[in-house]
Swiss-Prot record:
A GO cellular component annotation in the UniProt record: cytosol
Gene that this polypeptide is encoded by: IMPA2
Family: Belongs to the inositol monophosphatase superfamily.
Species in which this protein is naturally found: Homo sapiens (Human)
Name under which the protein is recorded: Inositol monophosphatase 2
Role: Phosphatase that can use myo-inositol monophosphates, myo-inositol 1,4-diphosphate, scyllo-inositol-1,4-diphosphate, glucose-1-phosphate, beta-glycerophosphate and 2'-AMP as substrates in vitro. It is likely that IMPA2 has an as yet unidentified in vivo substrate(s). Has been implicated as the pharmacological target for lithium (Li(+)) action in brain.
């Protein structure tokens, strides 16, 4: 018996098509909420440090995304930033798992600096299947699906292909720790790359959007200690599908729970940066 036309369409779309479409629609809905809230007064709290901020909109958006997905996919698991901050464990099992950052760039959001995003990643059997990132203020929808390419508003993304660090624009983020030892290491790593004649090192306040800039070819590399799995999951798929590389700062394979990453347009670039970095210890997401 041949599959029906509807069945053939579903097979062509892939086994997680419904999940992907749900992620896109929820990212767009969340973006509308964030755009409206950006200009309004906010109730701001701190989490692990004075620089680690959370607002009522973070909670509202996360609750919206999880409640909608849980209703549609009741057997799926969830890892989300604010739930983790409230004590939920970050465990990546073989079950279908949603990895969610409701507002990446909360400090930007608090200050009405318009570089903020919603990030929704999806993994099955501990392998990332797709990522959806929505730049709320510029209305740019970044998507990546394993084996099917990466796109921004329907336009295919490609990394720059740069291999020479002396011709590279490198992006990073500071991370939430502000103690003297951590700041010294952060500034030392930046100094090492500048001594290596990188064109520049930029901090934009949103790791997910920085990684999307890498995927689009607007930057050549990214590194960070202290980012979490919800910052990285969706962007990893997008970068890989745009032809880039995402690895651990040791130079080994990416460990999504290790709170550290080097991403680059080429493996040569990634290894050059990994070799230059001093490690800043942030622990692991699955041990907190």
């Amino acid at each position: 018996m041949k599959p029906s036309g509807e069945d053939q369409a579903a097979l062509a779309a892939g086994p997680w098509e419904e999940c992907f479409q749900a992620a896109v629609q929820l990212a767009l809905r969340a973006g509308q909420i964030i755009r409206k809230a950006l200009t309004e007064e906010k109730r701001v709290s701190t989490k692990t440090s004075a620089a680690d901020l959370v607002t009522e909109t973070d909670h509202l958006v996360e609750d919206l995304i999880i409640s909608e997905l849980r209703e549609r996919f009741p057997s799926h698991r969830f890892i989300a930033e604010e739930a983790a901050a409230s004590g939920a464990k970050c465990v990546l099992t073989h079950s279908p798992t949603w990895i969610i950052d409701p507002i990446d760039g909360t400090c930007n959001f608090v200050h009405r600096f318009p570089t903020v995003a919603v990030s929704i990643g999806f993994a099955v059997r501990q392998e990332l299947e797709f990522g959806v990132i929505y730049h709320c203020t510029e209305e740019r929808l970044y998507t990546g699906r394993r084996g099917r390419g990466a796109f921004c508003n329907g336009q295919r993304l490609r990394v720059s292909g740069e291999t020479d660090l002396s011709k590279a624009l490198v992006l990073t983020e500071i991370g939430p720790k502000r103690d003297p030892a951590t700041l010294k290491l952060f500034l030392s790593n930046m100094e090492r790359l500048l001594h290596a004649k990188a064109h520049g090192v930029r901090v934009i306040g949103s790791s997910t959007l920085a990684l999307c800039h890498l995927a689009s070819g607007a930057a050549d590399a990214y590194y960070q200690f202290g980012l979490h799995c919800w910052d990285l999951a969706a962007a990893t798929v997008i970068i890989r599908e745009a032809g880039g590389i995402v690895i651990d700062t040791s130079g080994g394979p990416l460990d999504l729970m290790a709170c550290r990453v080097v991403a680059a347009s080429t493996r040569e670039m990634a290894m050059l940066i990994a070799q230059a970095l001093q490690t800043i210890n942030y622990g692991r997401d699955d041990e907190k």
